[in-house]
Structure formats: C-alpha cells, structure tokens
UniProtKB/Swiss-Prot annotation:
Region entry Disordered, spans: 38-58
GO biological process, alphabetically ordered: DNA replication; plasmid maintenance
Domain of life: Bacteria
NCBIfam families noted in UniProt: RepA_IncFII_LM
Keywords: DNA replication, Plasmid
Stated name of the protein: Replication initiation protein
Record-linked Pfam families: IncFII_repA
Length: 340
C-alpha cells in the first residue's frame, strides 16, 4: 500500500482533547514544536506507470478558405482570435484565450488552484476559433455536438479522416467544456435523455454566454441588435407562428429559441439512430440469405416504400438496380458466399 502524507497543522486547529494532549507532551519534553503531524493514512491508490500525455498535444484549427467569411460581431470576434499573413496567407493565433485575465480572476470560483497546464492551454486556444466559427448568430449555440467538435479539431490525413493516434478524444474535450461552463463563459444543454435503443445519450451542445463574448472583445450592444434581428428572421420563429404559438408581432426569446433548437436536434438524432438501427437489423437478416434472395427481399422492401405512381412505372430492371445499390449501402458483399 502507498502512504499518503498530509501537511502539518498548528495545535490550535486540533480538537480540545488533542490540544490538551499536545500541551501535556510539550510540558513533559516529549514534543519540541507546536506543529502537529497528523496520523499517516494508508490508501490503496497508486500512481500507474501509464503515460498521461494526450494523443494530440498541439491541436490547431483555422477556418478553411472555402468557408464564407463571418459577418457582424461574429466575424469581429474571429478576427480578434485569428490573424492571416497577407503575403503567405497562413493563419495563426492573434489572441491566446488561455492567457486571458478572466481565467485568473475566476479561478477559485471555478474550483481551480493553479493555472492551466500547457497541453490544456493549447487545446483551449484551438477550441475558441471553432466555437465562434460555428456559433449561430441568433441563439449563439454552437451547431456541433461535443463529439463532432472533437472530430473537427483532431488532425486528419490526406483523405480527410481523423488520425486515431493523434485524435482529440471526446472525453478530454468534454472535461474542458465542462470546466468552461464552471467559469461561466459557456453554457451547456440540460441533462440529455437516455436512448435505450443505442444505449447512448443524445448529443450535448454548448453556447457562448455574454461573459464569453465580453472576453472576445465584441461590442455587446451591436451583438445584441444582430442577435435580435436574426431571431426575428429565424426559421424557428416562423415555425412557431405557423403553429399558432406566436403572433406575427411577437418576438421569440433567446432561451425559447435555444430550447426549441435543441429539441429539433434531439429529434433528428433519434430519427437518424432509428434508421441506422433498422438498416443494421435488416442487413443482419439479409446476410443469412443467398445473393439472389438478398436482391429479391430488398426489391420487395423498396417497392413497399415507393409512392404508388412511381411503383406503377418502375420496371423490374430498375427495381433490381435500386436493390443492389441499397445492398451496397448496407455493406453487404454480394460476391461472398452466404454463411453456413
């Protein structure tokens, strides 16, 4: 077992019974100091031999050239974070958010004692350009889930796929964002629902709070005006008006728009997961059949989903082509023999 040592305490911090014992030892000459060493507590905790170094020590992310430039105060915030060399066109950080005095002022409030470690500083500097770049002008919600943000920041190969050895893990980014929520610069969606089908929780999203925008140095008055204008033009408000929840002259609040947006994202995630689970279940059933039987079963399935007018004019050759294409999408190799 490993031993855990606790710093010494002054005798005045001890309970009354122990204070009497300390003075008795001091008068008897058995104690020569007023600092009392507490009993050593034994624990089973051990420092492992594994490396705690993150996979991606120096993540970076800049807005690609093919992206449309951000407008208004969002563009101003991004330009304060990132600068572009006019000669070479290379982008680099103009402002390191990890060194902002706000993190020093609110350190105790967030439950920290010390400054950020270098690897966390670099991750925090890389996260903020992504948050600003994908933030909605109306709700200030980042349009990516935490797992999608981790994938976006992670280094990629020439084909655009994440390199597993250098990826930014979801757990690492999730801990960082949760700490930013404690600092008050980010907000996070409420506790997500549990999806029994996939045994996973629905995605979580974050948004930038007014404290976060103030750190970025934007004009809060202009930001609020642009936010209200975008909310009045938003699809969420038009949908509520069509449903009769809002009148034409009523405005939607930021909280209501954000809650409605998150509900839509949750429903989209559920639909996608249900469709994916149904496709996988169908693929597992078709794997047991011969190739010609797979095509026949898939053809019947496609025919049932077709509109009546389209199904009437669909030829057997066209239906077979659709079935083969659907089978390839289900990752079924028709050339392989069926399992026995």
């Amino acid at each position: 077992m490993a031993e855990r040592y606790i710093s010494q305490r002054h005798w005045s911090q001890l309970p009354p019974e122990e204070q009497i014992r300390v003075w008795e030892d001091y008068e008897a000459g058995r104690a020569t100091t007023f600092l009392v060493e507490p009993e050593r507590k034994r624990t089973k905790r051990r420092r492992g031999e594994h490396s705690t170094k993150p996979k991606c020590e120096n993540p970076t992310w800049y807005r690609p050239a093919r992206y449309k430039a951000l407008s208004g105060q969002l563009g101003h915030a991004y330009n304060r974070l990132v600068k572009k060399d006019p000669v070479t066109g290379e982008q680099s950080l103009r402002m390191h958010m990890s060194r902002h005095p706000f993190y020093v002022q609110k350190r105790t409030f967030a439950g920290r004692k010390y400054a950020f470690r270098p690897e966390k500083q670099r991750l925090l500097d890389a996260v903020w350009p992504v948050l600003v770049s994908f933030s909605d002008a109306g709700t200030h919600t980042v349009g990516m889930s935490v797992s999608r943000l981790a994938k976006e920041i992670s280094p990629k190969d020439s084909k655009g796929k994440v390199i597993p050895e250098l990826e930014v893990t979801v757990s690492r980014l999730s801990r960082l964002l949760a700490e930013q929520v404690r600092f008050g610069v980010l907000g996070m969606s409420e506790e997500t629902m549990w999806d029994r089908e996939t045994r996973q929780r629905l995605p979580r999203y974050v948004w930038i709070t007014p404290a976060g925008w103030q750190m970025l140095g934007v004009d809060m008055v202009k930001l609020h005006e642009q936010q209200q204008k975008r909310l009045r033009e938003s699809e969420i408000r038009q949908q509520l008006i069509r449903e009769g929840v809002l009148r034409e002259d009523e405005d939607i609040s930021v909280h209501a728009a954000r809650k409605r947006w998150y509900l839509q994202r949750s429903q989209d995630a559920l639909k996608h997961r249900r469709a994916k689970a149904a496709a996988r279940k169908r693929a597992n059933l078709l794997k047991k059949l011969p190739a010609d039987q797979q095509i026949y079963e898939m053809s019947q399935h496609i025919l049932k989903r077709m509109p009546p007018d389209e199904a009437y004019w669909c030829t057997p050759e066209r239906l077979q082509q659709l079935a083969i294409r659907e089978l390839y999408q289900l990752e079924l190799t028709l050339a392989a023999p069926p399992p026995h």
